[in-house]
Amino acid sequence: MRSPVKHLLSLALLLGTLPVHADNAPKGDYWVVHHQASLGKSKAYLVDGDPGNIYERPGGVKSVGVYLFDQQPGKPDFTVYDVEVDCKNKRARVTGALDFSSVANTLRKAKFSNQWQGDQQPWLAQSRDFICKPAERQALKMEHLGVMSASELSRSGPQLFELLTREAQRAEIIRQIDDAFTQMPAK
């Protein structure tokens, strides 16, 4: 049984300087499960929903890879988390994490807490719900990005942030319009 973090080590190789034939690159089925968008500080959490990349653990626990893309300067290009999900007890935890930086072409262990959590961290709760409530993904506003290789996923980061920032700006404009209508006197 492979660990998603070990499986995702191939991601670093794909993104490095080693040439890889595109047909042989492992692919995942990626979904945006949580995002926080603001100008220059956007974060997006993606889950690989490919059933072949979701691992069964003892006790009914499932393990899945979650990717954090962080737009802030000085942050790694992305962080890969190995997340265990316990649907029965409505909890999730991180069991491993790696930061990838394309500037230095490095892969380093990232800090994380391995404590079981309920809803304390929205991205972790959404990752749990992605696995435990697959029929509700659209209702939970999870966006399907599609099937792609890890290298394609990493290259899509800038476009993803453009889209998320545009959506955040749109939502703010709509909120301001709604506030303006609320403040108008009734006739």
Where are these regions (language model features)?
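N-terminal signal peptide c-region/cleavage motif recognized by signal peptidases
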Residues: 17-19
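Hydrophobic helical h-region of N-terminal Sec-dependent signal peptides
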Residues: 9-15
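Bacterial N-terminal signal peptides that target proteins for export
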Residues: 1-9
